[in-house]
């Protein structure tokens, strides 16, 4: 009787997984890519950096080399203690398109990136804003063109893909990129069905009026992180949000090099998610619950060999469906190599996520440098 109930439970969570992977994530994975027409609208590219001198030297020139007729580059130095501000000042002297915003430590907003970004957004002279981070670089000289091509009169928020550079012979790098792929497949899929809920600040564009319509970051200013996902969670609607996933629109940054650094980064991300709207917390929680439950139920039923052929069939079919859904997404996002490890990476992430939840119950994660 107990095992029969467990089998029904396995079937139920497998069904939930099919709904996610086919009906939601599949809206992105299996959809034909949409291409927008170049708009050539004036754009303010905004980069907020804190102690990123080494990256600034390499990546700001790549931003200035963009094939785009009218844009300014707003460089925000968030009270850096290294050479970041000096480098920004040099770029401002050398190129009239560069505008420097200097942010000094403010007791009311100590170490708060949202305060720095707010000053940068107010300083931007153009209505259309394109964001990336100080440690990111565009995948092509057409990054601005591609991201802005998705703007229309109605679509005033564009979610882009912030990828991580590949590192040969690094298992951790593959795990991080797999997680990034899974996360992107989720928020692109939900955006495609009219339920946008998050984005990444490494690659995000929106019209300035969207920022002021929700009073900027004021409603969550005390939450140290979330300048990207909490803002989108509040401002994005089915009508005003779209995505951009052409390869030329990607940005890249270097992934964490140690498990500890990556784990702490995940702690920050998950601590922000608890401030999402109730429905978004439910949709994310249900997906994770179905992942964990499916794995545990399958292990128990197979270990006791209860209706093992039926159980094995459900497990195999579930992994095939998930593999196809994520595999097509991986093809679009140029992450195919991580799919060879899919079942192992998924199981590892499920238990890492559980570890993060438990750790966050007992201590608060560190935030902006």
Show which residues each predicted segment covers.
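N-terminal membrane-anchoring/stem segments of glycan-assembly enzymes
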Residues: 1-38, 326
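Short, well-formed alpha-helical segments that are part of the catalytic scaffolds
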Residues: 24-33, 52-65
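Cell-envelope/extracellular polymer assembly enzymes that use nucleotide-activated donors
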Residues: 41-44, 72
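Acidic donor-binding segment of Leloir-type glycosyltransferases
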Residues: 60-107
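Acidic donor-binding/catalytic loop of UDP-sugar-dependent glycosyltransferases
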Residues: 83, 133-149
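Short aromatic/hydrophobic "clamp" motif used to bind/position activated sugar donors
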Residues: 117, 129
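Catalytic donor/gating beta->alpha subdomain of glycosyltransferases that bind UDP-sugars
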Residues: 151, 157-183, 209-212, 216-281
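Membrane-embedded multi-pass helical conduit in multi-pass membrane proteins
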Residues: 287-364
